[in-house]
Amino acid sequence: MAGHSHWAKVKHQKGLTDIRKGKLFSKLSREISIAARLGGGDPTFNSRLRRAIANAKDEGVPLENITRAIQKGTGEIAGSHYEDVLYEGYGPGGVAVLIEAATDNRNRTTAEIRNLFSKYGGNLGAAGSVSWIFQKKGRIVLDGDQNDFDRVFEVALEAGAEDVEQKGSEIEVICLPEKLDELQKHLDTAGLTIKSSQITYLPKNSISVTDKETFKSLYRLLDILEDHDDVQNVYANFDAPQELLEQCE
């Protein structure tokens, strides 16, 4: 599918230090809490919670952390009240940046995100300023070593997938957001191994970034945003030459 962001590839290549792993666990737990608060603590009847739990398990989040996050969301134990916030802005080179955040203090997070944009050569925009550049989609990732691509392709398309693509050792399936749960059930029923599934944003088009200094500035901005405690996901609509991407590995 055209318009896939290179940022997803870059951050996947970076790997996890202990500090980053701790932050990832915290962010995954926060998503579980929000999902439980909005849709209840039973994953059988809460698809967002079901996906959040599966993704947390895939990343190695301990079961007790998952249980505690659910209980915080349902109010069974005390915890912060988090809400979803979507931030939009432009980075160096005119690259559109979309940020999903989960915060217990919207004013604090907004001020901090605005400061990061300004500090690293971008600017935070108003609601709707860049979201039109992205499409909301369902995304399922399967293990390419444990699944036959042709089989995944066949089952996914029959179940309504829009796109199936081999990406290194993984197989990526893209669908409409409302088709995600149904598609995942079809893949599960077919005995295919799913690594993760989520609602994501894909850019409709991409901006080519070829200047080294512009790319470095853009990377610094995206990296610092990704590292922010309240930020869950960062999306950007850029393409860059392989030699620039390799500098981030």
Swiss-Prot record:
GO terms for molecular function: DNA binding. Keywords: Cytoplasm, DNA-binding, Transcription, Transcription regulation. Pfam families: TACO1_YebC_N (PF20772), Transcrip_reg (PF01709). It is found in: Cytoplasm. Signal peptide: none annotated. InterPro entries: Integrase-like_N, TACO1_YebC-like_2nd/3rd_dom, TACO1_YebC_N, Transcrip_reg_TACO1-like, Transcrip_reg_TACO1-like_dom3, YebC-like. SUPFAM superfamilies: YebC-like. Its main location: cytoplasm. GO terms for cellular component: cytosol. GO terms for biological process: regulation of DNA-templated transcription. Belongs to the TACO1 family. This is Probable transcriptional regulatory protein Minf_0651. It comes from Methylacidiphilum infernorum (isolate V4).
